[in-house]
UniProtKB/Swiss-Prot annotation:
Protein name as annotated: ATP synthase epsilon chain
Name of the coding gene: atpC
Coiled coil, from the record: none
Entry keyword set: ATP synthesis, Cell membrane, CF(1), Hydrogen ion transport, Ion transport, Membrane, Transport
Membrane topology: Peripheral membrane protein
The UniProt record lists the keyword Magnesium: no
The species this protein was found in: Mycoplasmoides gallisepticum (strain R(low / passage 15 / clone 2)) (Mycoplasma gallisepticum)
Record keyword Membrane present: yes
Role summary: Produces ATP from ADP in the presence of a proton gradient across the membrane.
InterPro entries linked to this entry: ATP_synth_F1_dsu/esu, ATP_synth_F1_dsu/esu_N, ATPsynth_dsu/esu_N
Gene Ontology molecular function, alphabetical: ATP binding; proton-transporting ATP synthase activity, rotational mechanism
SUPFAM superfamilies referenced in this protein's UniProt entry, alphabetically: Epsilon subunit of F1F0-ATP synthase N-terminal domain
Assembly notes: F-type ATPases have 2 components, CF(1) - the catalytic core - and CF(0) - the membrane proton channel. CF(1) has five subunits: alpha(3), beta(3), gamma(1), delta(1), epsilon(1). CF(0) has three main subunits: a, b and c.
Family affiliation: Belongs to the ATPase epsilon chain family.
An example Gene Ontology CC term for this record: proton-transporting ATP synthase complex
Length: 130
């Protein structure tokens, strides 16, 4: 087992012992577990997968992150990290509609990019919501 700790600007989002985490970077998916060589890995906005000690697996949605690992600890510094089981389809659809409305009404390029990024994250969450 290895400890996975996820930190964000809003505090600690996850802090548990796991068997493995699989995340997606620019070059594809990579898995990290106990005794992995020390590494730094950039994570794209993507879906990752956690395997727990009891062999259950859960999907997670990760927003712009960097992973650091050594043999006993994996740290992920992310803007957001949400376990798919905790996602609400109705809440995501509401945020999606709000963002689409704002995008339609926005003329500022910087704001449009920010809103589009937020919409991309909501669409990723929508794929994983049950």
């Amino acid at each position: 087992m290895v400890k996975l700790k996820v930190l964000s600007p809003n505090g600690t989002l996850f802090d548990e012992k796991i068997e493995m985490v699989i995340v997606k970077g620019a070059e594809g998916y990579a898995g990290f577990m106990r005794n992995t060589q020390p590494s730094i890995f950039a994570i794209n906005n993507s879906v990752g997968y956690i395997t727990y000690p009891d062999k259950t697996k859960k999907s997670v949605v990760i927003e712009n992150a960097t992973l650091y690992c050594n043999k006993d600890l994996i740290k992920i510094f992310a803007l957001d990290f949400v376990i798919a089981d905790n996602l609400s389809y109705d809440e995501i659809m509401k945020r999606k509609k709000d963002l689409e409305s704002k995008i339609k009404d926005t003329t500022d390029t910087k704001e449009l990019i920010r809103l589009q990024h937020a919409l991309d994250i909501e669409l990723l969450k929508l794929k994983e919501a049950k």
